[in-house]
Regions:
Chain A
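Arg/Lys-rich amphipathic alpha helix in sigma70-family domain 2
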Residues: 62-82, 103
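C-terminal flanking helix
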Residues: 16, 20, 41, 118, ...
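DNA-recognition helix of helix-turn-helix
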Residues: 65, 136, 140-169
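Internal acidic/polar
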Residues: 78-103
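A short pre-motif secondary-structure segment
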Residues: 124-128
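Structural recognition of an alpha-helix C-terminal capping motif at a helix-to-coil junction
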Residues: 35-42, 54-66
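A short, charge-rich alpha-helical start-of-domain segment used by transcription regulators
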Residues: 1-21, 31-34
Length: 174, 443
C-alpha cells in the first residue's frame, strides 16, 4: 500500500463518519451519501497519487461539498418537498429524521440556494450552519481570518433571505 | 408556498445540522471505502487542463481573453459546418441567410471557483459583420475599478486576406496575413457571423421548443439546448443551458442566452460562464469605412505571417512545444502562452526571462511572435477537421520518448493515413496498421 493510501485510511478513521454525516445532510439520502463517500475517496486517491495535498482534511471536505451539490443539481427529481404550509414545524428538541427533512420544502430550497453558491462562501456557510463548526476552525480550514468567515456567512444569510423570499423565482438554472 | 423568513432559515438549518445518518449506514460507508482503499491502486491520472480555466488565471488577461475568441472560433468549426433538418428553426436559418449585415452585442461573465485562484471576469463586445466587407469587433472589459475599458479591436477582412488586432491602450497594431485557405474557410464557415453558425449547429442537435413569450415588447418563440456535449468543452461534468429567442414576426433572433458550468479543478469547484448575444440590428446599413482599421500616430506596427498549414509546420510547432514543456500539450488547440509561462524547461525560463520587465505592449508583441509556430500546428489541425480528414491527436498520453506511438494522424486517402509519431518522424500507413498502432497507445 502506498503512502497516499495510508494517509487516506487515516483520514477515513479520523473523519469518515463526519464526512458521511455531511454528505447525508446535503443529499438527505443515506444511500446516496454512501455512494458519494466512495466517489470522494476515489477522487482523493486520484489526486493524492499525483500531487501533494497540504491540508487533506480541508481538501476532502471541499470535495465532499462539491460532490453533494453536484448530485443535487443533477438529481432534482429525488428532492421532494412539501410546501411549507403543509409541513410540521420543526421543533428543536425533536431528533430530526431523514423522512421529515426530505419532505421539508424549506430545507430543500435552502440547500438548492446554497448549491448555487460557489467557492469559499458555500464552504464557509455549510461548515458553520450545517456542520456547526466554530468561525476559528473554519478560518483555519479555508485559510482566512475568523472575521472574513463571519462576513462571508453573513452575506450568504442575506442572500438566502432575499432569494427565498422571492416566491416562485427560479433558482440555479445550471 | 408561504414566504420564508430569516427565522425560518435559521431554524431549519439548525434542524438539518442535528441530522445524523444511521450507524448502519455510516458503518457501511466507511467499511466500503476501507475495502476499496485496500484494493485500489489507481494509476496516476491527470485532469484535462481546460483552456478557459487557464485563460482566467492568466496575468495577461487582455491577451488571453482575445485568445478565447480565436479558440472558440477554431473549436466551433467542427459543428458550425453541420446542417440538418428542422422546421421552425430551419425557417429562422433561412431568414438569417438572407441578411447582408448585422450588428449585435455580446457579453460574457464568468463566476465561481475559488476567488483566490480565479480572476472574476466580465467582458462585452460589439460585433458588426457584413457579407461584403468582413467583420469587426470591439472588446471591452470591466477593470478592477468597475470601469469598462476598451482593449482590443479586431478586424477580419477576407477581401484583403488580413486579420488586424489593435490594442488602443498599448498603441499596438498587429496585422496577420491570411492564406487563401484561411479566407475560404472564413467565408464558408461564417466564423464572423456567429448567429448563422450557431443556428446551423443547433439544427443538428436535439433541441426543445419553449412556449411563446414577450421580450422587450416583442413576441418571441424560444428554443433550448441542454446537451453538454454540444457546447465548447469547458471542463469536467459540464452542464449547459442554451436558449435562443426569435421574433415570431421577422423570424430573426433577438437574444441568445447561454449558461454553462464545469468543474475546473480536482476538488470539483465549478466556474459558470454566462454568455448573452443581444441587441441585434439585422440588415443594418454599413459603410466600407467602418471596416478600415484606424491608423494613428505613435502606434507600433507588427506584421505576422503564419507559416503554411502542412505537416512540416505541424512538426515544427510540436518541436517548439517539446522545448517549452519537455512534453506535448494535452490539447493541440491550446494556443495560449500560459503553459510556457509556468514551465521550468530552459526554453521556457528563457522566454520568461525575456518578457520580465517588458511593458504590457512589448509583452504582447513578444508573445505574438512566440505563438507563431504553436498557432501553426493548431491551425493545421483545425484545417484537417475542417476538411474532414479524420484527424486525431494523443498528446495527453504520448511523450517524446514514445518513438513508435501515434502522436497525431490524419487521413490522406481511403487507403492511407499519415502519422506523426512521438519522436516526430512521420510515416504513411494503412488503416489496418493505424488501428494496430492506436490499440497500443499508452492509457
Amino acid at each position: 500500500m502506498t503512502d497516499c493510501h495510508k494517509q487516506l485510511l487515516e483520514l477515513l478513521d479520523r473523519s469518515g463518519a463526519k464526512l458521511h454525516a455531511l454528505l447525508t445532510r446535503l443529499t438527505l439520502h443515506e444511500d446516496v451519501a454512501e455512494e458519494l463517500m466512495q466517489e470522494l475517496f476515489i477522487k482523493l486517491s486520484d489526486v493524492a497519487t499525483t500531487k501533494k495535498i497540504s491540508n487533506l482534511d480541508s481538501y476532502a471536505y471541499r470535495t465532499a461539498v462539491n460532490l453533494a451539490f453536484d448530485w443535487r443539481r443533477s438529481n432534482k427529481s429525488r428532492q421532494i418537498g412539501v410546501p411549507l404550509d403543509e409541513v410540521a414545524e420543526p421543533v428543536s428538541s425533536d431528533f430530526p429524521t431523514l423522512d421529515t427533512l426530505i419532505q421539508n420544502e424549506v430545507i430543500q430550497k435552502i440547500l438548492t440556494a446554497v448549491g448555487c453558491l460557489n467557492g469559499a462562501a458555500r464552504e464557509a456557510f455549510v461548515m458553520r450552519y450545517i456542520q456547526q463548526e466554530s468561525y476559528e476552525f473554519i478560518a483555519g480550514q479555508l485559510d482566512k481570518t475568523p472575521h472574513q468567515i463571519r462576513a462571508l456567512c453573513s452575506r450568504v444569510t442575506n442572500y438566502l433571505r432575499d432569494t427565498l423570499s422571492s416566491v416562485g423565482e427560479e433558482m440555479c438554472d445550471v | 408556498m408561504s414566504k420564508i423568513s430569516e427565522e425560518d432559515i435559521r431554524r431549519n438549518l439548525e434542524f438539518l445540522s442535528q441530522l445524523q445518518p444511521s450507524a448502519q449506514s455510516t458503518d457501511r460507508a466507511v467499511q466500503c471505502v476501507r475495502r476499496m482503499l485496500a484494493e485500489y491502486e489507481q494509476p496516476p491520472k491527470t485532469k484535462n487542463a481546460n483552456v478557459w480555466s487557464i485563460i482566467m488565471k492568466s496575468p495577461i488577461t487582455k491577451l488571453a481573453v482575445a485568445a478565447v475568441v480565436i479558440i472558440a472560433c477554431l473549436i466551433g468549426l467542427s459543428f458550425w459546418r453541420t446542417t440538418g433538418s428542422g422546421i421552425a428553426l430551419a425557417d429562422v436559418l433561412a431568414q438569417i441567410e438572407k441578411v447582408k449585415s448585422v450588428r449585435w452585442q455580446w457579453s460574457y461573465k464568468v463566476t465561481g471557483g475559488d476567488p483566490n485562484t480565479y480572476d472574476y471576469n466580465e467582458t462585452r463586445v460589439t460585433w458588426l459583420t457584413s457579407q461584403e466587407y468582413g467583420s469587426k469587433s470591439t472588446w471591452e472589459w470591466l477593470d478592477p475599478n468597475g470601469e469598462w475599458s476598451q482593449y482590443v479591436e479586431r478586424y477580419l477582412l477576407p477581401q484583403k486576406k488580413t486579420e488586424i488586432v489593435i490594442y488602443p491602450t498599448e498603441k499596438i497594431y498587429i496585422c496577420q496575413e491570411l492564406e487563401d485557405a484561411d479566407v475560404e474557410q472564413i467565408k464558408e464557415d461564417n466564423i464572423a457571423r456567429d448567429p448563422l453558425g450557431i443556428l446551423k449547429g443547433i439544427l443538428e442537435t436535439k433541441y426543445e421548443s419553449l412556449s411563446k413569450s414577450t421580450m422587450d415588447g416583442v413576441e418571441v418563440a424560444g428554443f433550448r439546448i441542454t446537451d453538454p456535449n454540444w457546447f465548447i468543452n469547458l471542463g469536467e461534468n459540464q452542464q449547459v443551458d442554451y436558449k435562443i429567442w426569435v421574433d415570431v414576426k421577422t423570424l430573426l433572433p433577438v437574444r441568445f442566452d447561454v449558461l454553462a458550468s464545469a468543474e475546473v479543478d480536482e476538488m470539483g469547484d465549478r466556474l459558470t460562464h454566462h454568455v448573452v448575444m443581444h441587441d441585434f440590428q439585422w440588415d443594418v446599413p454599413v459603410d466600407a469605412a467602418e471596416f478600415e482599421p484606424p491608423i494613428s500616430d505613435g502606434y507600433t506596427f507588427k506584421v505576422i505571417k503564419l507559416p503554411p498549414s502542412n505537416e512540416e509546420t505541424a512538426i515544427q510547432g510540436l518541436k517548439v512545444w517539446v522545448e517549452l514543456l519537455d512534453k506535448y500539450p494535452e490539447k493541440i488547440s491550446d494556443v495560449t502562452p500560459q503553459l510556457a509561462l509556468k514551465s521550468k524547461t530552459p526554453a521556457a525560463l528563457r522566454l520568461q526571462e525575456e518578457i520580465k520587465g517588458l511593458t504590457e505592449g512589448e509583452t504582447i508583441i513578444k508573445l505574438a511572435d512566440f505563438l507563431v509556430p504553436i498557432r501553426g500546428v493548431a491551425r493545421f489541425y483545425v484545417l484537417l477537421v475542417h476538411d474532414k480528414k479524420d484527424p486525431a491527436y494523443y498528446g495527453k498520453t504520448v511523450t517524446p520518448k514514445n518513438a513508435d506511438k501515434v502522436l497525431m494522424r490524419w487521413k490522406v486517402s481511403d487507403n492511407e493515413y499519415r502519422v506523426i509519431f512521438g519522436d516526430l518522424h512521420a510515416e504513411t500507413v494503412s488503416p489496418e496498421k493505424l488501428a494496430e498502432l492506436e490499440a497500443a497507445l499508452p492509457k
